[in-house]
Structures are given as C-alpha cells and as structure tokens.
Amino acid sequence: MIRQLYQLSYAVLLKIVMLVVIGVVMLGAIATPALADDYNKETLVNADFSGRVLTDSSFTKANLRSSNLSHADLRGVSFFGANLETANLEGANLTNATLDTARFTRANLTNAILEGAFAFNAKFEGAVIDGADFTDVLLRQDVQNQLCKVAQGTNPTTGRDTRETLMCP
C-alpha cells in the first residue's frame, strides 16, 4: 500500500515537472521583437557596424568619426547631432533617418539611400555622394546647392540619378 502511494506520488510529481518544462520551453519559443539600440552620446570612433541591422536605433550626439557603417540597415535611425566625419556609409540604407545637425564632413555616402531623411541642418562638406539617393530629403538650400556641385551617378538599388533626387538645375 505504501509502495503504491509512493509510485502514485512519483508519477504526479513527474507530470508536474514535465508540464513546467514544457511551459518554459513554450514561453522561450515566443519571439520577442527586436529592440532598437541606444548609442546616444557614445564615443564610437572607428567602430564597425558594417552590414548590421540597426533600424530605429538612436545615435543622438554620438561620435562615429571614421566608423564603418557600410551596407548597414539604418532605416529610421536618429543621428541627430552625431559626428560622422570621414565615416563610411557606402550602400547604407538611411531611409527616413533623422540626420539634423549631423556632420558628414568627408564621409563616404556612395550609393547610400537617404530617401525621406530629415537633414535640414546636416553638414556634408567634402562628402562623396556618388550614386546616393536623396529623394524627398529635407535640406537647406545652400547645402543642396553645395551637393549639386559634386552630385553624379545613379543609385544601383533604387535606379535613381543623384542629381535628379537632389533636384539640381
């Protein structure tokens, strides 16, 4: 009798443990959404973000001088007030990014997509913009004129001419 009671208790305990294990596994299987990263005010000089998916991340006032962001997915990213001097953004997707007051001095924006980005007070002195797509980018008129002086090429992804996307005369 005691032996049967012991076996029954063991069987019930084993079932409870199995249910707990299955529950934990099921909870772990539920996909959690990717959270945007926060790099605000970080010093990221020479950092390598090439090819990374960083959608909706924030680099507000970050120092990304000489960093590699080539072919990165930067859609919706905030680079507000960021230092991107001499950064490599070749082939990066900056669609709908916030670039206001960012410094792209001597940055490589070859074949980058900046469609719909807000870049009103961004600085682009000496930037390479061959094949960059500036469709619907909000720029100051003097910056637009400056970029039109060096604009050339066609973006290989969107098929748009850089000069046309800047609405150059």
Question: How would you name each of these model-derived features?
Answer:
Residues 2-9, 14-169:
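Tandem repeat scaffolds
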